[in-house]
């Protein structure tokens, strides 16, 4: 009250009104009964075992699928190997046949060159004969 005596008005602190509906009450945590804990543990272990069994089964099935895919791939590669061997064998046969035909192909090339040379000679002979004929006709007219 000394402040009031000095001329400063005394302020009174007002507290906010309490709303009892907004206040939560805490309940004491109770330990579940021993039988409930045992039942929950059994249930948890059972469900965990089911889950792990499912996971292991799925993984096992994945590995079986992968093994089957590897076997099929191996068979496909063996088929491709056989095909490649057959192609190689056929190619060797064709190369041998081509080597056997090579002398005849060389002869054909030589004959083709000779025919071209003979054709050129025939054109020259034809041109020469035309010139000769023109000269003969010219001399005949005189």
From Swiss-Prot:
Induction entry: Overexpressed in injured nerves.
UniProt subunit comment: Component of the biogenesis of lysosome-related organelles complex 1 (BLOC-1) composed of BLOC1S1, BLOC1S2, BLOC1S3, BLOC1S4, BLOC1S5, BLOC1S6, DTNBP1/BLOC1S7 and SNAPIN/BLOC1S8. Octamer composed of one copy each BLOC1S1, BLOC1S2, BLOC1S3, BLOC1S4, BLOC1S5, BLOC1S6, DTNBP1/BLOC1S7 and SNAPIN/BLOC1S8. Interacts directly with BLOC1S1, BLOC1S3, BLOC1S4, BLOC1S5 and SNAPIN. The BLOC-1 complex associates with the AP-3 protein complex and membrane protein cargos. Component of the BLOC-one-related complex (BORC) which is composed of BLOC1S1, BLOC1S2, BORCS5, BORCS6, BORCS7, BORCS8, KXD1 and SNAPIN.
Organism: Rattus norvegicus (Rat)
Gene from which the chain derives: Bloc1s2
The keyword ATP-binding is annotated on this UniProt entry: no
The name this protein goes by in its record: Biogenesis of lysosome-related organelles complex-1 subunit 2
Bias (Basic and acidic residues): 11-33
InterPro entries referenced in this protein's UniProt entry, alphabetically: BLOC1_su2
Major subcellular site: cytoplasm
Compartments where located: Cytoplasm, Cytoskeleton, Microtubule organizing center, Centrosome; Lysosome membrane
Residue numbers spanned by region Disordered: 1-33
Residue ranges the record marks as coiled coil: 79-127
GO biological process per UniProt: anterograde axonal transport; anterograde synaptic vesicle transport; endosomal transport; extrinsic apoptotic signaling pathway via death domain receptors; lysosome localization; mitochondrial outer membrane permeabilization; neuron projection development; positive regulation of cell population proliferation
Function: Component of the BLOC-1 complex, a complex that is required for normal biogenesis of lysosome-related organelles (LRO), such as platelet dense granules and melanosomes. In concert with the AP-3 complex, the BLOC-1 complex is required to target membrane protein cargos into vesicles assembled at cell bodies for delivery into neurites and nerve terminals. The BLOC-1 complex, in association with SNARE proteins, is also proposed to be involved in neurite extension. As part of the BORC complex may play a role in lysosomes movement and localization at the cell periphery.
Source taxon at top rank: Eukaryota
Family: Belongs to the BLOC1S2 family.
């Amino acid at each position: 009250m000394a402040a009031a005596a000095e001329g400063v008005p005394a302020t009174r602190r007002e507290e906010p009104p309490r709303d009892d509906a907004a206040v939560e009450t805490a309940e004491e945590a109770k330990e579940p009964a021993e039988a409930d804990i045992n039942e929950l543990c059994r249930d948890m272990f059972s469900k965990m075992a089911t889950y792990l069994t499912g996971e292991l089964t799925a993984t096992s099935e994945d590995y079986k699928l992968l093994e089957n895919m590897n076997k099929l791939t191996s068979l496909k590669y063996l088929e491709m190997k056989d095909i490649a061997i057959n192609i190689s064998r056929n190619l060797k046969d064709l190369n041998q046949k081509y080597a056997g035909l090579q002398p005849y192909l060389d002869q054909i090339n030589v004959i083709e060159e000779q025919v071209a040379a003979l054709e050129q000679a025939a054109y020259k002979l034809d041109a020469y004969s035309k010139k000769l004929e023109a000269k003969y006709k010219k001399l005949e007219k005189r």
